[in-house]
Amino acid sequence: MVGLQPSERPPTTSVKFLAAGTAACFADLLTFPLDTAKVRLQIQGENQAALAARSAQYRGVLGTILTMVRTEGPRSLYSGLVAGLQRQMSFASIRIGLYDSVKQFYTPKGSDHSSIITRILAGCTTGAMAVTCAQPTDVVKIRFQASMHTGLGGNRKYSGTMDAYRTIAREEGVRGLWKGILPNITRNAIVNCGEMVTYDIIKEKLLDYHLLTDNFPCHFVSAFGAGFCATLVASPVDVVKTRYMNSPPGQYHSPFDCMLKMVTQEGPTAFYKGFTPSFLRLGSWNVVMFVTYEQMKRALMKVQMLRDSPF
């Protein structure tokens, strides 16, 4: 079947770390417009006065993308990409690259099988660790994605990615770069469990029952299932996180206040705003990322083995 075959030696932690960050950046490059559309749909309706002043209304994934291209230009779909890539190199490297190592750490000595609880603990741990390191990049990414640039008074607040870090720190304090870290930790712990644990289990069962071999089709099916589960369980927290991180100072007192206002003003369905682009983005992102990740691990191990070989 297509793809590199597994290496004789299991991949090292450093190989997984590098492969995860690189694969996540590649997945971001391909799916970033869907992520931007998701952010626009999630924040739509949170400020009715601002919404009424906008000429652009978003309806559905394709409608959002087409509206953005028409009113802001195609480059708007990739607004915040630099921060997004910075985020993945610091975020995915930890939550994906260290997952197996943390899973082994939680697995009791003498056991050759990791329980579901062990995998969930590993997913929560690496997800929380990754957010703690990458939170400022996520804040900047969302600020860029949420801002409209129409040329009709929609001037850019930030001249670039580094200017965004400096401006947020100057105007909102250093804490502004860590705004929404609690809902983000919650969201990414859930997403990481949904992604890594589901991928781990589906892949394991497909191989145990000899339904597929350890190659592209197996990785594709496992990644698609992981993307759906992650979107389903994490969407409510993701909407709250996006709105809170994008909000101006004083709009919400806390993530909990943001959640209450969403329920009272828009109803419980607001928690699943942007679900379709979330799934399209997370599902496609997972497929691209995990397939690339598996192949990169094998390629890097082959390079390492060739380098270590005396001949």
Swiss-Prot record:
Mitochondrial intermembrane compartment residues: 1-10, 100-119, 200-216, 294-311
SUPFAM superfamilies xref list: Mitochondrial carrier
Keyword Glycoprotein: no
GO biological process terms held by the UniProt record: adaptive thermogenesis; fatty acid metabolic process; lipid hydroperoxide transport; mitochondrial transmembrane transport; response to cold; response to superoxide
Solcar repeat feature ranges: 11-105, 114-205, 214-299
Gene3D superfamilies tied to this protein: Mitochondrial carrier domain (1.50.40.10)
Stretches in topological domain Mitochondrial matrix: 33-76, 137-182, 237-270
GO molecular function, one term: oxidative phosphorylation uncoupler activity
Cell location: Mitochondrion inner membrane
Span list, region Purine nucleotide binding: 278-300
Transmembrane segments: 11-32, 77-99, 120-136, 183-199, 217-236, 271-293
GO cellular component terms given for this protein: mitochondrial inner membrane
Protein purpose: Putative transmembrane transporter that plays a role in mitochondrial metabolism via an as yet unclear mechanism. Originally, this mitochondrial protein was thought to act as a proton transmembrane transporter from the mitochondrial intermembrane space into the matrix, causing proton leaks through the inner mitochondrial membrane, thereby uncoupling mitochondrial membrane potential generation from ATP synthesis.
Family (UniProt): Belongs to the mitochondrial carrier (TC 2.A.29) family.
Record's subunit section: Interacts with HAX1; the interaction is direct and calcium-dependent.
Entry protein name: Putative mitochondrial transporter UCP3
